[in-house]
C-alpha cells in the first residue's frame, strides 16, 4: 500500500468517525432543566438574610444576564389558607400539577368547621373498634399551628370526636415542633391543648382526655431512615420508655428547656397521671395519626403496622395488636395496602401532571435529589404517585449522615450536581427536575453562618449546571418551592427564625430565547412554562399560564 493510499484511508476513517459523532450529537435531546432551590425566597431587607449575605458570583452573573422575576409560593396561590406560608410538599405538588391544588389541610379544616369531620367513617370506626374491645384511643401528631405537617385544630377536634363517640380514655402523644414554629414555643401549644382538654373533660363525664407523652419531632418525624431516632418515639409510645417523667406536660417542657433542649429536640418524656404509670399503646387500642403530610409520618407508621418480614428499622420489643390504626391521609401505597390500616382522607386524583403529560408525549424525564427532598421531586411532584412514568429515571443521592445540617451546610449538593451535569451531557433527557435541599434544611437549623455557607455551596452548583445547559443548547428555569433562609431571625419572638416564610420566590430563565418574566405568577405556572419551552401545548387540566412572554 502506498503512502498516498494510507493517507486517503486515514482521512476516510476520520471523516467516518466525525460523521458518526455528528449523528450521535444530532440524536441528543435538548435539555430543559427545572432547578428547585428549596427554601430560597426573595426578601428585600438584607438584615438576617443568608442569601443577601452570601458570596454568589454565579447567581449574580445569572441575574445580570438573564430574565428574572418573582412568583408567589404561599397562601391561596398554592391552595393554602390566606397568609399561610408554603412548604415543600405543597410547593412541589403545585409545581408539578400546573394548577392550584387545594391542600388536604384546607379540606380537613373545612370539615372540622362544618362538623363533617365528626362523621368521618375511618375515624369514627376506629373509636368504636376500641370501645368494642375495651381498649383506649390514642392520638399522636405534631402539636403546632405551623400548618406544614399538621394543624392543632385537627388534633383538638379528634379529642372531641373520640368522646362524642363514646371513648372512655383518650391519650394524646404530642410531637413538638420548633422547626415550622419558633424553637421554644411549645408551651403555647401545650397550654392551649390543656385548656381544651379541661373543657372536654368537664363536659363529658363518661370519658376523659389526657396528654400521655411529649417528644421532639427530630425523633418522631424522621424521613431519612434514621431508625435510631424513630425507635425512641416508638418505645416512648408503646413502652413508656423515656428520659424524663413528669406529672404535667408544661412542666416537662420547662424541664427540657433547662436541659438546653429546644422543641424539635426534646427527649422522650412520659406524662404520668394520678396512678403514676405511663399511658402506653396496648392490645385492643386504636391509634390515630393526625399528621396530614405523608413524608415525615411514614417511618413511625411503618413501625406500628408492618410485620417483621417487611420491617427492618429496629427490633420492636412490643408490637400491640391494635383495634385500628388510622392515617389522617394516605402516607404511602405500602401503608395503604396494609390490612391493619385505614385512611381518613383519601387523595383527590390528578390527571395530566407534568410527568404524566410528558409520558403521553413520548418524552423522557429525570428526577434527581438527595434523600431529604427525594420524595418531593418524585412522589409529590407527580401528584402523589409512587411509581415512575414510562421514560422517567430517578436518581437518589444519599444525604450526609450528620445530626444536623449546619455541620455540613453543602449537604450532598456537589454529588447531586455531578450526576445532574452528567445527565445533561448524556443527551438522554427532555426534562430534568432537580431539587437542592440546602436553603431549607440548613435554614431550619436557625444558624446564620451555616445558612450563608449553604447558599455559597449552592452558587457553585448553579454555575456548573448553567454551564452544562448552555453547552447543550438547552433552557433552564430556576425557582424555589417556598422561602426560608432569606430570614434567619424572628423579630416577634426574639428567637432565631427556623420556619418557612411567605415571601415570593425567584423565577429565572436561563437560555437564549428573547423573553421576559411576566408579573403575577405563581408556582402552578411553572409546568406550563416548561411545556411552552418545548413548544408543547399544555393540557386543559393545567390552568397555570406561561410565565415567559416576548421581550419588549
Curated annotation (Swiss-Prot):
Keyword presence, Magnesium: no
GO biological process: glucose catabolic process; glycolytic process
Binding residues annotated for Mn(2+) 2, in chain numbering: 38, 88, 481-482
Pathway: Carbohydrate degradation; glycolysis; pyruvate from D-glyceraldehyde 3-phosphate: step 3/5
Cofactor(s) of this protein: Mn(2+)
Purpose: Catalyzes the interconversion of 2-phosphoglycerate and 3-phosphoglycerate.
Family: Belongs to the BPG-independent phosphoglycerate mutase family.
Protein name (record): 2,3-bisphosphoglycerate-independent phosphoglycerate mutase
Amino acid at each position: 500500500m502506498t503512502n498516498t493510499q494510507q493517507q486517503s484511508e486515514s482521512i476516510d476513517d476520520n471523516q467516518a468517525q466525525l460523521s458518526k459523532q455528528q449523528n450521535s450529537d444530532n440524536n441528543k435531546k435538548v435539555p430543559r432543566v427545572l432547578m428547585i432551590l428549596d427554601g430560597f425566597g426573595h426578601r428585600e431587607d438584607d438584615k438576617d438574610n443568608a442569601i443577601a449575605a452570601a458570596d454568589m458570583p454565579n447567581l449574580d452573573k445569572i441575574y445580570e444576564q438573564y430574565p428574572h422575576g418573582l412568583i408567589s409560593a404561599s397562601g391561596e396561590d398554592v391552595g393554602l389558607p390566606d397568609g399561610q406560608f408554603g412548604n415543600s410538599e405543597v410547593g412541589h405538588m403545585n409545581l408539578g400539577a400546573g394548577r392550584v391544588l387545594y391542600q388536604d389541610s384546607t379540606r380537613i379544616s373545612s370539615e372540622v368547621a362544618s362538623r363533617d369531620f365528626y362523621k368521618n367513617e375511618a375515624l369514627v370506626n376506629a373509636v368504636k373498634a376500641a370501645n368494642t374491645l375495651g381498649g383506649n384511643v390514642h392520638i399522636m401528631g405534631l402539636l403546632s399551628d405551623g400548618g406544614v405537617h399538621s394543624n392543632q385544630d385537627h388534633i383538638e377536634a379528634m379529642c372531641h370526636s373520640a368522646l362524642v363517640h363514646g371513648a372512655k380514655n383518650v391519650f394524646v402523644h404530642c410531637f413538638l415542633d420548633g422547626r415550622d414554629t419558633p424553637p421554644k414555643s411549645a408551651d403555647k401549644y401545650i397550654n392551649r391543648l390543656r385548656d381544651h382538654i379541661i373543657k372536654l373533660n368537664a363536659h363529658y363525664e363518661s370519658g376523659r382526655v389526657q396528654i400521655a407523652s411529649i417528644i421532639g419531632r427530630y425523633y418522631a418525624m424522621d424521613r431519612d431512615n434514621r431508625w435510631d431516632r424513630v425507635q425512641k418515639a416508638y418505645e416512648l409510645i408503646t413502652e413508656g420508655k423515656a428520659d424524663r417523667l413528669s406529672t404535667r406536660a408544661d412542666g416537662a417542657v420547662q424541664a427540657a428547656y433547662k436541659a438546653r433542649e429546644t422543641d424539635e429536640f426534646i427527649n422522650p418524656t412520659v406524662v404520668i397521671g394520678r396512678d403514676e404509670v405511663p399511658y402506653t399503646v396496648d392490645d385492643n387500642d386504636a391509634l390515630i395519626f393526625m399528621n396530614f403530610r405523608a413524608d415525615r409520618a411514614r417511618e413511625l407508621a411503618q413501625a406500628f403496622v408492618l410485620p417483621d418480614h417487611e420491617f427492618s428499622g429496629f427490633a420492636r420489643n412490643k408490637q400491640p395488636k391494635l383495634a385500628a390504626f388510622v392515617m389522617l391521609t394516605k402516607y404511602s401505597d405500602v401503608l395503604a395496602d396494609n390490612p391493619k390500616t385505614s385512611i381518613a382522607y383519601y387523595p383527590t386524583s390528578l390527571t395530566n401532571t407534568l410527568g404524566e403529560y410528558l409520558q403521553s408525549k413520548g418524552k423522557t424525564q429525570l428526577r434527581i435529589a438527595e434523600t431529604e427532598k427525594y420524595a418531593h421531586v418524585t412522589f409529590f411532584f407527580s401528584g402523589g404517585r409512587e411509581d415512575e412514568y414510562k421514560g422517567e429515571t430517578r436518581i437518589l443521592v444519599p444525604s450526609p449522615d450528620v445530626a444536623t445540617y449546619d455541620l455540613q451546610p453543602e449537604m450532598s449538593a456537589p454529588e447531586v450536581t455531578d450526576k445532574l451535569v452528567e445527565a445533561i451531557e448524556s443527551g438522554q433527557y427532555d426534562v430534568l427536575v432537580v431539587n437542592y435541599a440546602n436553603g431549607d434544611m440548613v435554614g431550619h437549623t436557625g444558624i446564620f453562618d451555616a445558612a450563608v455557607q449553604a447558599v455559597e455551596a449552592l452558587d457553585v452548583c448553579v454555575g456548573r449546571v448553567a454551564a452544562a445547559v448552555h453547552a447543550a443548547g438547552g433552557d433552564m428555569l430556576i425557582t424555589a418551592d417556598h422561602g426560608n433562609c432569606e430570614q434567619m431571625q424572628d423579630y416577634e419572638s426574639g428567637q432565631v427564625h427556623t420556619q418557612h416564610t411567605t415571601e415570593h420566590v425567584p423565577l429565572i430563565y436561563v437560555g437564549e430565547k428573547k423573553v421576559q418574566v411576566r408579573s403575577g405568577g405563581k408556582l402552578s405556572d411553572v409546568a406550563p412554562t416548561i411545556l411552552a419551552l418545548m413548544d408543547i401545548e399544555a393540557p386543559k387540566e393545567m390552568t397555570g399560564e406561561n410565565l415567559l412572554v416576548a421581550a419588549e
